[in-house]
């Protein structure tokens, strides 16, 4: 299998954590790329042009980080990260909340870089920031439900928190100030799970 990836994307990191958790590193070749390069191999067969993108051993292409993560989870031998028990929907719901935070963040980051900072756009960006602040605090209020078990929701929330620290100068939110207990929880998860610690974002 081949995974087209970057070292900074929280979506890619989600997939890399799954790979590390299931010790699939020897089965997945990492192909570093930049999504915007039109002649990158992953863009030749990837209509979305996004990363991560996974090419299976059968030559089939899989798109979307959650789909790729679930596919790799199905191949793994360790504890499943997509639980099928009574907490199935709760885990997926927390994952969806983390996904919403990233959608809000990427929306205003893109607009901030592309558009002038008129009063209207500034107001729109501030609205997205305030939504993220509310959502981080919501997650902090539900730490008991999140627990310390590694699953697709908890690992993705850690990815989001670490991405906010990594891009804090652009995002403008410090999780340690906004939701300190949630931030400490994320750092503890990093210390406890090697698959998280070894995949932290960095600029290659």
Predicted segments — roles?
Residues 12, 62-63, 82-83, 151-156, ...:
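Generic, ordered loop/turn and secondary-structure boundary motif
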Residues 24, 171-173, 195:
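Helix N-cap/coil-helix junction residues
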């Amino acid at each position: 299998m081949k995974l087209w990836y970057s070292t900074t994307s929280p979506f890619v990191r989600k997939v890399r954590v799954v790979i590390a958790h299931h010790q699939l590193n020897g089965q997945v070749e990492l192909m570093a790329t930049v999504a915007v390069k039109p002649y990158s191999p992953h863009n030749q067969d990837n209509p979305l042009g996004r990363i991560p993108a996974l090419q299976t051993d059968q030559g089939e292409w899989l798109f979307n980080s959650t789909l790729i993560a679930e596919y790799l989870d199905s191949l793994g031998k360790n504890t499943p990260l997509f639980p099928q028990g009574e907490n199935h929907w709760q885990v997926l719901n927390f994952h969806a909340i983390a996904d919403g935070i990233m959608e809000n963040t990427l929306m205003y980051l893109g607009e901030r870089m592309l558009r002038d900072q008129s009063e209207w756009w500034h107001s729109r960006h501030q609205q997205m920031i305030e939504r993220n602040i509310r959502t981080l605090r919501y997650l902090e209020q539900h730490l008991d439900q999140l627990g310390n078990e590694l699953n697709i929701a908890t690992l993705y929330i850690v990815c989001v928190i670490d991405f906010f620290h990594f891009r804090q100068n652009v995002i403008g939110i410090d999780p340690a100030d906004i939701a300190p207990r949630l931030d400490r929880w994320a750092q503890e998860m990093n210390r406890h799970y090697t698959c998280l610690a070894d995949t932290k974002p960095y600029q290659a």
